[in-house]
Amino acid sequence: MGRGYRLVLVTDRRGSAYSGLLGDLETYRISAAGISGRGLTARISAVFQLGLGWLQARRLLKQLRPRAVAGFGGYPSVPTVVAASQLHCNTIIHEQNAVLGRANRMLAPYAARIATSFDRTDMLRDRDQARAVHTGNPVRPEIIEAATPYRMPEGDDPIEILVTGGSQGAAIFNEIIPPALASLPDALRGRLRVTQQCRGDGLALVQAVYREAGIQAELAPFFSDIPARLARAHLVIGRSGASTVAELAAMGRPAIMIPYPHATDNHQRENAARLCDAGGGWLIPQEDATSEALSALIRSVLESPDKAGRAAECARRVGVTDAAERLADLVCELIGDNAHMKQEQPKEITA
């Protein structure tokens, strides 16, 4: 929109429920369904839905005549990107994770460009590597605006710990993190200020553990001001979804990551590994994440300010704060608009 293009969102029924989060965006709905991990009858139905979506997408694309179509993963993007390629429209796909998702693996042969969030993406075939461009994963503007230089607290200053676990918190975090923090030495424990995303059904028990340990803690299923809390954090403990890793790197905050073990193709572990291999944090597989192991790691980080500071700097170095601009540039380059001239007629579609 900022470059003068008309943007259109093409998604399925589930995605259309979130279209309002993208502002006043023209939205079209097509049929789509996932295939993987389903029974035979469900797979047959999914293939039918994808075929119907392809017909709907072809009809829509002929009507809109877009200059470019961009797919952001998930099965709803499959019919539109395939139809666009067959209609000789410029196509691009973007992969958020360090492992190419199943939908994007299907779409890679149809894409003129493959935008990646990491400098290395697993399951990207050799023949597709030449079309891959590292753009990074766009983060919310609020993250960039809230970013401040990292400073580890000194003396008796409070230590801010931010615990996140996905949209509703991770149940296992309620079990292992409070006792891990409670078992820290008195000198550290008394300085802790914990903010923890905590499922409502376990909130009272978690609060009781913190209260008994004398730890100041703010608990809630959801925090609307995560960018500000992330900026204040001296250490983050959380999962390693694509957005979480991108925001940690863009903000430059050290993190202990416990990947969700059931993520498709174990992509959360690979996301965390990319950041940790660069020195930006520490990875603990969930099967190894006992309270004792976690407490020992937290203590080693908090008692060695230089260690946390180095991790913050390493995270910041791999962070891509202009990923949205890079992605927009890639689309403009693809359609031949190198000067990013504002025009009324050309259109981009986000599938």
Language-model segments: residues:
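Active-site-proximal region of nucleotide-activated glycan assembly enzymes
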Residues: 6, 14-16, 85-148
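A short, well-ordered alpha-helix in the C-terminal region of glycosyltransferases
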Residues: 307-321
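C-terminal alpha-helical cap of glycosyltransferases
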Residues: 320-351
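An aromatic- and histidine-rich active-site surface loop
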Residues: 14-18, 66-87
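Donor-nucleotide binding loops and adjacent catalytic segments primarily
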Residues: 1, 10, 14-17, 22-25, ...
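An amphipathic, basic-hydrophobic alpha-helix
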Residues: 39-68
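Conserved donor-binding/catalytic loop of nucleotide-activated donor transferases
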Residues: 87, 231-233, 249-258, 278
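Acidic donor-binding loop of glycosyltransferase active sites
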Residues: 66-68, 231-246, 253-254
